[in-house]
């Protein structure tokens, strides 16, 4: 897909907001993509700490509870491409149960993914819809469980959240790209962590430039 002249909405969390980046204008991944691909416009809807699913118990920081589903209503309706990049905070500190495939309400993660995709398709029918699943981070080896999961939430691994997204995508015709495969940064490797994601989760300026390149490759691979 040729990206030149396109308008892209980016719906995401702290990574999309630019946490860890020292020069937002020059190095946050959406702005890098805009510059490299000669986009018409990028609209950044990233809010740190936010989740796809509804939070049953209020967070200490109220902004964390502005979930993706609610915010999906308030984006630029004229955008050519809608990008959703999230899921890590649902795993790290969301209190919604993971639920079952077939859920359609916002009370579970499964249901929220369905609800979000359904809403985006209805509100932005002429746009190309793309979902990026979480990249590698400090806690995604498939064996480690987070130490302080929300009270009364069952134990699950990060890859299970990713698989739910991948399983739901065919119902709505979204394109999906797994950033744990597409982005060659693994913060569990000390060298890569120090170079690209010092806290094990959020990318620095160099990491955002690599993220931008990965997103560009994925978008350009779409046959449109």
Language model: regions and residue ranges:
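Conserved SGNH/GDSL esterase-like catalytic core that processes O-acyl groups on lipids
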Residues: 2, 7-9, 15-107, 111
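Alpha-helical cap/lid subdomain in secreted, periplasmic
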Residues: 66-224
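Short hydrophobic segments within beta-strands
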Residues: 11-12, 132
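Short alpha-helical interface patches
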Residues: 1, 10, 17, 179-187
């Amino acid at each position: 897909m040729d990206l030149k002249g396109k308008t892209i909405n980016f719906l995401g969390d702290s990574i999309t907001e630019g946490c860890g980046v020292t020069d937002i204008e020059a190095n946050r991944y959406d702005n890098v993509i805009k510059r490299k691909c000669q986009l018409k416009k990028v609209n950044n809807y990233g809010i740190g700490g936010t989740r796809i699913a509804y939070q049953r118990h209020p967070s200490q920081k109220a902004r964390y509870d502005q979930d993706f589903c609610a915010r999906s209503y308030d984006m630029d309706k004229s955008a050519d491409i809608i990008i959703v990049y999230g899921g890590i905070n649902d795993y790290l500190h969301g209190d919604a149960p993971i639920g079952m495939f077939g859920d359609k309400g916002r009370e579970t993660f499964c249901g929220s993914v369905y609800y979000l995709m359904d809403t985006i398709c209805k509100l932005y029918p002429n746009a190309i819809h793309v979902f990026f699943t979480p990249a590698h981070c400090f806690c995604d080896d498939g064996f480690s469980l987070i130490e302080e999961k929300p009270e009364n939430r069952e134990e699950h691994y990060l890859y299970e959240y990713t698989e739910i997204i991948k399983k739901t995508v065919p119902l709505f015709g979204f394109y999906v790209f797994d950033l744990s495969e597409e982005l060659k940064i693994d913060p569990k490797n000390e060298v890569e962590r120090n170079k690209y994601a010092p806290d094990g989760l959020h990318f620095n300026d160099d990491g955002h430039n690599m993220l931008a390149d990965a997103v560009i490759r994925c978008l350009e691979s779409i046959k449109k």
